A protein has these predicted regions:
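C-terminal motif of bacterial Sec signal peptides marking the signal peptidase cleavage site
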Residues: 28-30
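Acidic/His- and Gly-rich active-site-bordering loop/insert found
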Residues: 35-141, 150-153, 161-166
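Divalent metal-coordination and catalytic microenvironments
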Residues: 63, 102, 115, 145, ...
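Histidine-centered catalytic micro-motifs
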Residues: 117, 137-151, 203-209, 371, ...
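Acidic/histidine-rich catalytic neighborhood of metal-dependent amide-processing enzymes
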Residues: 147-220
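Midchain, well-structured core segments that form catalytic/ion-binding scaffolds
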Residues: 198-331
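His/Asp/Glu-rich mid-to-C-terminal helical/loop segments that flank catalytic regions of hydrolases
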Residues: 240-251, 255, 381-423
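Active-site-adjacent substrate-binding region
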Residues: 247-276, 322, 326-383
């Protein structure tokens, strides 16, 4: 369902007045006709965020208490829509399923900058050791998507307070079905960006670092995932052929577990064979997924596997194989990342940004699909609280994300968005 209102998409009259009065005060006696600096805009936005921080924490706790799995984010999308509509955003709903796209216009001729937040929860029965634990059987927020969504709403509060002084346009993309690996593609297929593609897109992902720390890597940061399907048929020895195929595929694997845990700085291939089948009609199949990363990794991966399989031959049997890209890798635009880091250092100096040690091979993220269409950067956002002894390792049974990460994420992303609006 699409929801449009011609009065939305620009801040309300009261909110514009509040924002302009705040910005006038920030000018500290300067000429009223001078446009505010982005530092002043950031300060105004964060003042507004500080005023609603308890509301944002309560919003996050509510999402955590009532998680929704991929493709079923009805309540979550409704809460997001309600919040952003009140803030004066133009809101589209039902994008790619239960996706929500909210746009705010300051300078209509300024750059369009997007921020993406995923909304869905993880299936399973985790411990969830927090006072606001999940009340939904079989669903828990143990990947931080409740934090991501709340950061998106926090950004909306901050930027709405700036009013017409916003030097561009912002698009907040609340994505469904990330855990299924399909949400980004579904939104892209449903014209998530409408008629105007953003100039840049940003995102954060919860990570096991202390609150106040963020981490990022230029170019390839998170592994992509490709499905490989090998089929043999005929009247030969199917069992022997399957074993040889499995062995050939595993020889194409370039990383062992020790290397995976240590991270990789070069392109790598990690193969997980998850399926094997044969039937009475003389057919057999070996299936698996290939996780890989690095610049231009896809041709490298395919060629390595093709070479391994093409060396095989079986008496009385024919072999066919195919590849299907399941998830794009997260590939951060290097120049955009450098500028974003500088913006965080200048406007949000309490946030520490460090390099990720190398490509993260153990996890995938479909944010890379958006990056295929729009240049962008994803940051890893620290959610640990060492004093409380809580650790937020995604998908772990004792996952806990500290509420303090909300303000950190909002602070950093508002800085990045405002800076990106400067031509």
């Amino acid at each position: 369902m699409l929801r449009r209102d011609t009065n939305r998409g620009r801040p309300s009259r009261c909110r514009r007045l509040y924002g302009l009065l705040s910005l006038t005060a920030l000018a500290l006696g300067g000429c009223a006709s001078e446009p505010p600096t982005i530092d002043e805009l950031h300060a105004t936005a964060m003042q507004s965020v500080g005023a609603v921080e308890p509301t944002l924490v309560a919003f996050r706790h509510d999402l955590h208490r009532y998680p929704e799995l991929a493709g079923a984010e009805v309540r979550t999308a409704g809460k997001v829509t309600e919040s952003l509509t009140k803030l004066g955003f133009d809101v589209r709903t039902g994008v790619g399923g239960h996706g929500v796209v909210a746009t705010l216009v300051g300078d209509p001729d300024g750059p369009l900058i997007a921020f993406r937040a995923d909304m869905d929860a993880v299936a399973g029965d985790a411990l969830d050791p927090v006072p606001y634990a999940s009340e939904v059987d079989g669903a828990h927020h143990i990947c931080g998507h409740d934090i991501h969504t709340t950061i998106g709403v926090g950004i909306a509060h901050g930027l709405a307070s700036i009013g017409d002084a916003l030097p561009g346009r912002v698009m907040l993309v609340f994505q469904p079905s990330e855990e299924a690996g399909t949400g980004a593609e579904l939104m892209l297929d449903d014209a998530v960006f409408g008629n105007t593609k953003p100039d840049a897109i940003f995102a954060v992902h919860a990570a096991p670092f202390p609150v106040g720390q963020m981490a990022v890597l230029p170019d390839g940061m998170m592994a992509g995932r490709m499905l490989v399907d090998v089929r043999v048929s005929g009247e030969g020895d199917l069992g022997s052929a399957v074993n040889e195929i499995r062995e050939a595929l595993m020889q194409a694997d370039t990383v062992g577990m020790e290397q995976i845990l240590a991270f990789q700085t070069e392109p790598f291939i990690s193969i997980n064979l998850f399926g094997q089948a044969d039937d009475s009609d003389g057919n057999a199949a070996v299936r698996g997924f290939v996780m890989s990363a690095g610049l231009d990794y896809r041709p490298y991966v395919e060629q390595r596997i093709r070479s391994a399989l093409d060396d095989l031959s079986f008496d009385g049997l024919q072999m066919q194989y195919s590849f299907k890209q399941a998830l794009e890798g997260v590939n951060n635009d290097a120049a955009m990342l450098s500028r974003a880091n500088a913006a965080i250092a200048a406007m949000a100096p309490s946030v520490s940004v460090s390099p990720v040690p190398g490509v993260i091979p153990a996890f995938s993220e479909d944010f890379g699909s958006f990056q295929r269409s729009v240049p962008g950067v994803m940051y890893m956002l620290g959610i640990d609280n060492p004093q409380a002894g809580t650790v937020g390792f995604p998908h772990s049974p004792d996952f806990v994300a500290d509420d303090g990460a909300i303000r950190v994420g909002v602070d950093a992303m508002i800085a990045v968005i405002l800076d990106a609006m400067q031509r």
